[in-house]
């Protein structure tokens, strides 16, 4: 315990520790947001298709989801600091492999597998190491900064990816990640390890059940856009007339239920569980985890919708799109840093509720501002509000979840917390995308159907084509496709008008569901403590 006091007591050491942990969180969040703007370039470079690169992104998410809870337990087995450093080394090798990848299989090995496994060790360890390096009164600020670093990475990722793709190569992003890993490892020597009790044995059956349950559930969610949530899309797999997505999600939930039953059995036999089911009966912990889920659902939904509007509807480059998203980082960092510092005794429940309302307000303001004639400037105020909400939540939720359990269980909580945020992020992106595409399809067909200038043959053909899925196209992309098809000027103009209206309708619908979800989360804030929590004693 002396090492913990020393690390927390020295301002210089505390800053170095916080820098190392925040840099780790930043690195974990940077990957996907960077690559989303570079998919086509990566596909061309490694000799594959856009679908192949999207599959690599999906695989990275799956690997993290599957190994996050076991990764938290590994930290209890070998030490949280060692797990953090080993995770960084694995992640660094993954980044180097990705930077040098000549083809898709090597990209999958480096990016999807090695980086995914590294992240599953790093993220739970960060949660435990913040708890062990900072006293209770400074923990909320530390968790806020670490969480803010991850959110800022998502916000600046498109800008970094745009700069790299435009002026250098996407490969330099991963070279930069290797350099960051080396820097983190140099700083990590100052980190005080979390206290480790008796070395537990890894529950292999529990690890398998949790990995399969989370993996199958997340895979189902990630396939929803391609296969359909309930009603299967044409040529999509189904069973009993229902999309395979439903069956995969149900199978995942069944496996997670079996996992919890198995863990309860382990406890009854006085054996070390992977996750103690008693933790999930902790009102404060489940409250914090639930709010983490909703935060990441709304947050990632917004990060899906806003770049689409800027890059496709307005035709901005990746560089300009990234620059327009940057204002979010200002209020996010300000709230995450200043709330714990200026209001150390403020009610966490009140801050969380205000943060949720800021998310809701940001989504509603953006929804109201969307218009066919609007410019990129309309996203600034909504993003400032959303950043404020994200920062407010980041300033409280980490401390709320970890302080709900003894410090010896902090890595376990870290694994569960990151699994929950992974689920929220996956569902948020998939839900926003599905609502957007479904609304676009309906709006486009309705507008075309009501237009007398469009021949009935074209209307029928459009219906058949769109039932199999509609892409989110810019006017330039649609006009090019229509010109190649040899359509008349009247039909082209009608289609462009319908596409413009459909895009706005789809974006508004996606934002509406995100705003509704934010409001829904308010009903779960009663589980957040009304006073600043202090760490539970071991």
Predicted ranges, named:
Residues 8, 185-214, 227-240, 265-283, ...:
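Flexible interhelical linker loops that connect adjacent transmembrane helices
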């Amino acid at each position: 315990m002396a090492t913990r006091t020393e690390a927390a007591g020295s301002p210089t050491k505390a800053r170095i520790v916080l820098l190392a942990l925040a840099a780790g969180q930043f690195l974990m969040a940077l990957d996907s947001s960077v690559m989303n703007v570079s998919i086509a370039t990566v596909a061309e470079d490694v000799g594959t298709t856009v679908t192949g690169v999207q599959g690599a992104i999906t695989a990275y998410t799956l690997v993290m989801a599957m190994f996050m809870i076991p990764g938290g337990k590994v930290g209890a087995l070998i030490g949280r600091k060692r797990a953090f450093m080993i995770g960084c080394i694995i992640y660094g090798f993954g980044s180097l492999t990705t930077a040098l990848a000549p083809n898709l299989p090597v990209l999958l090995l480096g990016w999807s597998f090695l980086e995914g496994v590294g992240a599953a060790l790093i993220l739970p360890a960060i949660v435990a190491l913040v708890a062990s390096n900072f006293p209770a009164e400074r923990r909320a600020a530390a968790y806020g900064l670490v969480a803010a670093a991850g959110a800022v990475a998502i916000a600046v990722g498109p800008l970094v990816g745009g700069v790299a793709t435009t002026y250098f190569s996407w490969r330099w992003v991963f070279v930069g990640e290797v350099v960051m890993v080396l820097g983190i490892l140099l700083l990590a020597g100052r980190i005080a390890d979390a206290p480790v009790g008796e070395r537990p044995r890894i529950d292999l059956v529990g690890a398998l059940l949790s990995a399969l349950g989370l993996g199958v559930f997340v895979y189902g969610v990630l396939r929803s856009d391609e296969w359909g949530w309930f009603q299967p899309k044409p040529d999509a797999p189904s069973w009993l007339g229902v999309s395979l997505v439903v069956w995969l999600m149900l199978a995942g939930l069944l496996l997670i239920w079996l996992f919890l039953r198995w863990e309860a059995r382990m406890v009854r036999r006085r054996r070390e569980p992977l996750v103690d089911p008693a933790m999930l009966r902790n009102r404060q912990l489940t409250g914090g985890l639930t709010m983490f889920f909703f935060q990441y659902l709304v947050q990632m939904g917004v990060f899906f919708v806003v770049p689409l509007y800027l890059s496709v509807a307005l035709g901005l480059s990746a560089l300009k799109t990234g620059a327009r998203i940057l204002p979010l980082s200002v209020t996010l960092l300000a709230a995450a840093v200043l709330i714990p510092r200026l209001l150390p005794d403020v009610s966490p429940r009140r801050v969380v509720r205000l943060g949720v309302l800021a998310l809701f307000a940001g989504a509603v303001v953006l929804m109201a501002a969307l218009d066919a004639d609007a410019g990129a400037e309309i996203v600034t105020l909504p993003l400032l509000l959303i950043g404020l909400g994200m920062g407010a939540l980041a300033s409280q939720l980490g401390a709320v979840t970890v302080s709900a359990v003894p410090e010896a269980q902090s890595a376990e909580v870290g694994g569960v917390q990151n699994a929950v945020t992974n689920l929220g992020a996956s569902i948020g992106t998939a839900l926003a995308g599905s609502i957007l595409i479904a609304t676009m399809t309906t709006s486009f067909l309705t507008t075309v159907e009501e237009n007398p200038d469009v021949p009935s043959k074209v209307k029928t053909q459009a219906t058949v084509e769109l039932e199999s899925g509609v892409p989110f196209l810019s006017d330039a992309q649609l006009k090019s496709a229509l010109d190649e098809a040899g359509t008349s000027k009247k039909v082209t103009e009608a289609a462009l008008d319908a596409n413009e209206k459909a895009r706005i309708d789809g974006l508004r619908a996606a934002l509406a569901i995100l705003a509704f979800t934010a409001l829904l989360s308010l009903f779960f804030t009663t589980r957040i403590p009304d006073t600043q929590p202090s760490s539970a004693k071991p």
